[in-house]
Design a protein with these regions (language model features):
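Intrinsically disordered, low-complexity linker/terminal regions across diverse proteins
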Residues: 1-187
Length: 187
């Protein structure tokens, strides 16, 4: 299991040995490797910029992995997509928000597999109010290997509801991995 350090180096943070009928678990040693760290004065501190968040798992043979974590009042399960989850063109998918509620959100995260990966996200409602307070018609950014870029919007703005970000087009010039959905959603 690898993660990037503060100097953008891919660092081995641990390993487990698995075999048929002998699954294992790995406890992430530091939660801020996977969870953003907002503060009262800067609630989007780790959003809308390249950050060293995320994990990369690798093995000698094919295997299945999932990520389970929890924060106060909420648990999350992220399934592994394997090599099928690596590519250069994706569409954002999440549950639509229909209620006016600031605890509901949508999110998309892009993680680079190679240095100097240019990513463009477009084809979404340009009236969306993202949590950084900026409305935009597209995103363009460059990531180093192992870096992530996290986008977030909440349900307390009418332009953010009813699937405004669903179907956003994510295109990169090198392979990336995408995680998207709702940290808090309506189902």
């Amino acid at each position: 299991v690898y993660s990037n350090d503060n100097l953008d180096n891919s660092v081995l943070i641990g390993s487990v040995t698995i075999s048929k009928n002998a699954p294992q678990y790995f406890q992430v040693p530091v939660r801020n490797m996977i969870i953003v760290s907002p503060t009262f004065s800067n609630p989007t501190a780790d959003l809308f910029k390249p950050v060293n968040k995320g994990l990369y798992v690798n093995g000698d043979k094919p295997f299945y992995a999932s990520l389970r974590f929890s924060v106060l009042n909420h648990g999350e399960l992220i399934t592994s997509k394997g090599m099928a989850g690596i590519g250069t063109e994706f569409r954002a998918v999440m549950a639509p928000m229909t209620a006016n509620n600031d605890i509901l959100n949508f999110m998309t995260s892009v993680m680079a597999t190679e240095d100097n990966t240019k990513v463009t996200i477009s084809d979404f409602n340009s009236n969306i109010s993202f949590t950084d307070g900026v409305t935009r018609s597209s995103f363009t950014f460059t990531l180093k290997k192992g870096q992530s870029y996290i986008i977030d919007g909440t349900g307390d703005y009418s332009d953010n509801r009813n699937g405004a970000f669903i179907g956003a087009k994510i295109v990169s010039d090198k392979p990336v991995s995408i995680t998207n959905g709702n940290f808090n959603g309506q189902y």
